[in-house]
């Protein structure tokens, strides 16, 4: 399990770096939807199981000649073997690091869950209802929203700032609402939680943090493109004005904001260069994305030679044998497993 986790984290990091390099050219050539779709590649790799043993190539050792000299092996009786040293030692460091990583991942996700629940409680406690959109999305105004935002997976909300009516003209209000409803329709809120769990597994990884920021930017630009499909220049200008008026620095990671300032330049550039892709271009984009996914996942899946190379490279860099760490972790967790079995028996 630890070996699979190490291979998965390293392979997902490589795929994140690949998407970071490709997202710009892909967005310029095929549009923001294609760039956003690329992020499925590292996400799927995070949950990709190892290749079954039956699918792996089998290496057969050559049969030795009958005249090859035999080998004599000496065994020491168990009673004569020295006892293993007790207590903490350097051999326990890898297991401690694995435990530290797991605690960091759990703590990261738990912190975001608690922070999001507190934010939702503040917004709902101070919010004033402004109706229901699309039959199931409640629209509220609250002083705790710096700009329009969507939140909630099961119970869906769109929160507007308290000065929404004064800050935005009627057309901008309609476009801002359409943007946030678009996030709900696309399932972006659930995707954001999945992205946070993945980031929690990579909490120590600077590549993952850069990938998360880029993923959120691509998500917003893909939603922009959906709202503005075949829009007139006047509508695009009004939409850009709404984005600028919504610019703010703070953001809730699990929510979808109309805008945060670190994405402003890229989104406005995208709005100014909008073009409608032909069906042929969309087919090429879909085919290329699918081919990249098949190649990337197939090349990095656990059980392949590439995955074995990843494991070997990690062992060489760290000087730690992953199989030994797995045995130590299993021994450390054995008492916990025994207690769990006893509890189930009662």
Task: Briefly describe each language-model feature range.
Residues 22, 26, 30, 182, ...:
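Juxtamembrane interface helices immediately C-terminal to a transmembrane segment
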Residues 52-54, 114, 119-121, 178, ...:
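Short helix/loop segments within enzyme catalytic domains
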Residues 1-136, 153, 164-166, 304-327, ...:
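Hydrophobic membrane-embedded segments
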Residues 159, 168-181, 185, 189, ...:
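Short alpha-helical catalytic segment bearing the HExxH-like zincin motif
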Residues 147-169:
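Active-site scaffold of zinc-dependent metalloenzymes
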Residues 2, 83-117, 147, 245, ...:
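Cytosolic-facing loops and C-terminal tails of multi-pass membrane proteins
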Residues 186-216:
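A Zn2+-metalloprotease active-site environment signal
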